[in-house]
UniProtKB/Swiss-Prot annotation:
One Pfam family recorded for the sequence: Ribosomal_L20
Protein name per UniProt: Large ribosomal subunit protein bL20
GO cellular component term of the entry, any: ribosome
PROSITE patterns, sorted: RIBOSOMAL_L20
UniProt organism field: Mesomycoplasma hyopneumoniae (strain J / ATCC 25934 / NCTC 10110) (Mycoplasma hyopneumoniae)
UniProt lineage: Bacteria, Bacillati, Mycoplasmatota, Mycoplasmoidales, Metamycoplasmataceae
Amino acid sequence: MRVKGGSITRQRRRRWLKLAKGYWGHKSIGFKTAKQAVVKSWTYAFRDRKQRKRDFRKLWISRINAAARNQGISYSQLMHKIKQSNIEINRKMLAEMAIHHQSDFENIVKLAIAKSA
């Protein structure tokens, strides 16, 4: 006896269409294109979770560089002096200090220059 499996097929398709809700055009109503769009979005999500880490690191470096140049030192020289003087602070915190706590950032720059000299 043949089993048609219509309800299971509908459930499976409904699940994919639910994942594609909000997509533009036929990607939200056509099963095949919806499935392709969802799989592609997962690919982008996986890739961009890695990319986000690189983007934030670039942002922190550019912010630290801008603040460091106001103090008369380049980013690379500052990081070298911080490492030489055994100041354990990461780029995220340095960038945060450079924007919101300028006086503390200036103190770290002065300390790094003084200790490494």
